[in-house]
Amino acid sequence: MSETKSIYINIPGVILAFIFESSLIFIFSFINIKYYKGKLSTIIIGGLGFICSVFLEGIIISIITKIFGQNSIMIIPFHLTFPGLFEETGRYICFKYILKGMNKDKLTSISYGIGHGGIESLLIGISFLRFIFIKETLIEQGILKEDLTFIYTLIGALERFITVFIHISLSVFVFKAIRENNIKFYILAIVIHDFVDFFAFLYQKNIVKNIFMIELFIIFFAIILSRYSYNLYINLENKKDEKIEEETNFSLKDKKVQ
């Protein structure tokens, strides 16, 4: 029987990371609703959109894996492209159909992004506890490869915080694609999503072994992306309700006649 590799886990760090990552959706939602008048329903739809997208992706990946085999090089392109394709298509469908009545308000894009990124952070925060309870199994499966120090958990928590901003940014991209009937922003969202995930793939496959370098790159990239999407958001205009606008115009004309 092979001896399980000894790996150190900083339990206080894991618990703090769990608390921080799990609370992000509540913190962002509170700020969005309290200070910017965002809608809770949109945040919930964003979370459900993420869950449905990942669920469908998992089913398709499972079928492909059965066809080609777990370790086949043929499934790599699917692992690299499906996350962006499914999640951004989920965003597109939600904005186009489910949230059609709320698309007049550009804040819908932010609220949806909070739900999407927040629920992902919540689920990852919960899964962080597995490092404590099933440590040996994760080591044997190759999921836990190195010491889980306090600094490591801190950077992981920070990366989750930054990832929420990435999801908000991508939501702005897809929202703009719907609002302006410009498909290139939807395609760009898919490409950006898969580009970010590609670096996680490099670490998982031991192509890049320095996790700190990957995390720092993602943080740096997220700052640039957030700045660009903020400019897109600012330039979006809230559409007025057509009925209200018609009534207002009619009222103004009526006053002029009098």
Tell me what each language-model feature is:
Residues 1-258:
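Hydrophobic alpha-helical segments at protein termini of multi-pass membrane proteins
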